Amino acid sequence: MRELAPAKVNLCLYVGPLRADARHELVSVMQSIELADRLELRDHDGPADEVRCEGVEGPNLAAQALSAFRELTGWDGPPQLLEVEKRIPIAAGMGGGSADAAAALRLLARRSGLGSEQQLFEIAAALGADVPSQLRPGRVLAEGVGDRLTRLADPPPFGLLVLPGAGGLSTAAVYAEADRLGLGRSTSELAVALAGLDTSSPEPVNDLERAASSLDPTIEDRRGRALEAGATHAMVCGSGPTVIGLFATPEDAIAGARALSRVGVDARASKPLATSE
């Protein structure tokens, strides 16, 4: 069995105050895009479940998803081998690990015939804030800590330029830097942002951008590169360090990626993934 694990981009990200449980309230419009990891699940001839992901060492969310699925559903099927082909940059603010975990849950539900929508959501929420929103690729409005989701209509076509960083950034480190810089909004300010939000065409705001740029000074150069390539807006994606450029059409984004690639810049064109895809 095979499944795609689409990356996500935060078209806007408003960060609220730090809660008692050390997590932040947020408001974000999240959009799945065509850039995706590829997963394959099959019976394993080994004694236990195994996840293989070239370039990723140690525990990962997909392995945790497999274990949690068995525990919650009681599935006692044969050992499974899950192979992940990475195409989404790692620790890049694009939800690659969360996308893999969500795709693994979809595969396991198909393979076992078990796992209600509520059970999958429960597992996803326990794995991480970004996982529930990626159980069903498309566009969502995320509130709370990313656990209150509202499905949104697919947007008109537009183009995206993805400019990864040379290394990754820890999401926890970026949020800690945001706290140090005092970037979080108050509860009332977050409510104002939500009230004025146009989910069909959100203003490209990322409250974590200053914090990510503080930890990775190369972000500003990549933002400039995206704008030079014709992007109408350029911003940090999620917790970074990836920069995304927004274009009126997918064709414009492809032209921008080609122009940057000619001068040695790692730039990839993509576009939104429709809910039905």
Task: List where the protein language model places each region.
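Conserved, helical-rich catalytic subdomain that frames metal- and/or nucleotide-binding sites
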Residues: 49, 136-233, 248-277
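ATP-binding N-lobe of GHMP and related small-molecule kinases
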Residues: 1-92, 110-114, 155-156, 164-165
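N-terminal pre-core extensions flanking Radical SAM catalytic domains
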Residues: 236-250
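Short, well-structured alpha-helical segments that form the helix of a local strand-helix-strand
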Residues: 116-127, 223, 254-257
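Short, active-site-adjacent cap segments at secondary-structure transitions
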Residues: 89-90, 169-170, 241-244
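DPxDG-like acidic metal-binding loop motif
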Residues: 92-118
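Short, basic/glycine-rich phosphate-binding loops at helix/coil junctions
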Residues: 42-56, 104, 125, 196-205
